[in-house]
Amino acid sequence: MNTLLMSLMIMIMSHEMPKLPYANNALEPVISQQTIDYHYGKHLQTYVNNLNNLVPGTEYEKKDLVTIVATAPDGAIFNNAGQVLNHTLYFLQFSPKPSQSEPTGKLAEAIKRDFGSFENFKKEFNAAAR
């Protein structure tokens, strides 16, 4: 089983910090180590700690993360569980050495249709971001 799937399964079942499948500096220069350290090491850790402090003695104590997010009413348990899930999915989607550098399939077709090429898309995207 790959690291991403294993980490996600462990996190969902036990409300633990997911293990990143890359070093904290592996995404530089796109995402800095400082950003990873702050958002992974502080934000996500705080949400995990909060959730683990909130669920004991509630109906959510033995439930997995997805079930908590799907069934908890608005409030602290729902918010922290949702943040754990969102942050985990965010961090686990990245790879320091992507297997492909350009989109494929329907996304590639839409980019080519709307921008002419992936290079043109990147130029326009970067210009719009400034």
Give the positions of each predicted feature.
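Feature for soluble, non-membrane regions of globular proteins
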Residues: 6-130
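Positively charged n-region of N-terminal signal peptides that target proteins for export
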Residues: 1-4
